[in-house]
């Protein structure tokens, strides 16, 4: 009997042990699935990086290596004449190309008009037309000899800096690349009009009425519909946008003008690192005309900063203009950041590697140092328009 019972117990124990082993193995298998999923995401990310690198290498082979042998803008004009119609793929937006075109329309991009655009830049430089941007498939078999009003035209500066312009925004000029190489890596990411052109969104929200949000009242109604909700921003990474309410007294704001202007605007949310509490985030305000501003509550001497012209632009470019700006305007918006000066220490440090490879860049920098002895030493960067 004892032997039979012991066998029965042993059999039951073996069954329990087998079940526990299966559960244990299954438990070990679940994280493996997660790790496989993470591995798939990592592989996809690596594939995207490889694709971008292949695209950059092709663009660099077609454009940068050719332009580096030129030492003046007249030579660049000859390059655009010889390579008329050559298509250079852009890193962003995907599916768009730069079509080399040296056309200088008498009414749009003649020397006189290019001079007016050059006056928009803080440190004036000579500009030439490099080409225009078109979506792949929209370009016919033969390149166009003229620019349409809505086209994005790429201009090259005398020191190798790259700009973008459209006659839909005639009083604005955007520096899309500190160097030619930099432009091919970034594409048109800095050009806010391009984000509107391809409907690129910095945060995604499910709301049937979001496309009609424009006025201050519309923004507040939108906030009330999504109050307490947090949305991930595409840039900066790991930062979120939160819609909520707050009653501010501005007791810590020392600047009387900033306190007065903030009191005239309406608070509708904040953004910042996703783990930060409300006190550590940047506040967002909307003015009566629909313009959006950001304000750092922890900066006692701080002032509001211009973020977007309206909520629709805010959806597409996010909070980038709170941190930095690349757009030169005839009339800068109030409290807007200015682009980094070309002759500043920061800009020279960012572009020193390119200067060793690009003959046009080397010559232009030598000319700048002769004309401006303090070039590369200026510290006035990111001034705010008051």
From Swiss-Prot:
Superkingdom as given in the UniProt entry: Viruses
Identification of the protein by name: Protein U3
Taxonomic source organism: Human herpesvirus 6B (strain Z29) (HHV-6 variant B)
């Amino acid at each position: 009997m004892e032997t039979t019972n012991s066998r029965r117990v042993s059999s039951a124990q073996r069954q329990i042990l087998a079940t526990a082993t299966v559960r244990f193995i299954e438990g070990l298998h679940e994280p493996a699935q997660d790790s496989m999923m993470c591995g798939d995401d990592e592989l996809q990310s690596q594939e995207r990086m490889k694709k971008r690198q292949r695209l950059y290498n092709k663009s660099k082979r077609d454009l940068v290596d050719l332009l580096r042998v030129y030492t003046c803008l007249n030579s660049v004009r000859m390059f655009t004449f010889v390579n008329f119609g050559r298509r250079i793929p852009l890193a962003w937006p995907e599916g768009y190309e730069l079509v080399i075109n040296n056309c200088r329309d008498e009414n749009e991009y003649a020397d006189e008009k290019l001079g007016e655009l050059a006056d928009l830049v803080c440190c004036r430089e000579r500009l030439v037309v490099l080409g225009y941007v078109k979506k792949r498939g929209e370009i016919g078999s033969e390149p166009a000899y003229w620019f349409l009003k809505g086209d994005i035209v790429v201009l090259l500066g005398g020191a190798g800096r790259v700009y973008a312009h459209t006659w839909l925004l005639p009083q604005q000029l955007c520096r899309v690349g500190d160097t030619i190489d930099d432009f091919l890596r970034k594409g048109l990411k800095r050009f806010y009009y391009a984000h509107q052109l391809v409907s690129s969104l910095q945060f995604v929200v499910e709301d049937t009425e979001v496309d009609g949000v424009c006025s201050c009242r519309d923004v507040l109604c939108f906030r009330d519909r999504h109050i307490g909700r947090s949305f991930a921003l595409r840039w900066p990474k790991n930062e979120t946008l939160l819609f909520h309410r707050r009653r501010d007294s501005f007791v810590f704001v020392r600047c009387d003008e900033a306190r007065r202007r903030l009191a005239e605007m309406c608070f509708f949310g904040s953004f910042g690192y996703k783990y930060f509490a409300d006190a550590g985030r940047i506040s967002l305000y909307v003015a009566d005309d629909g313009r959006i501003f950001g304000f750092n509550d922890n900066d006692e001497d701080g002032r509001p900063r211009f973020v977007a012209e309206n909520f629709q632009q805010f959806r597409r470019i996010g909070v980038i203009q709170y941190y930095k700006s690349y757009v030169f305007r005839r009339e800068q918006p109030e409290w807007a950041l200015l682009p980094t000066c070309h002759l500043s220490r920061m800009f020279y440090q960012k572009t020193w590697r390119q200067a060793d490879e690009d003959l046009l860049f080397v010559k232009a920098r030598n000319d700048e140092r002769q004309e401006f002895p303090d070039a590369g030493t200026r510290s006035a960067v990111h001034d705010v328009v008051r």
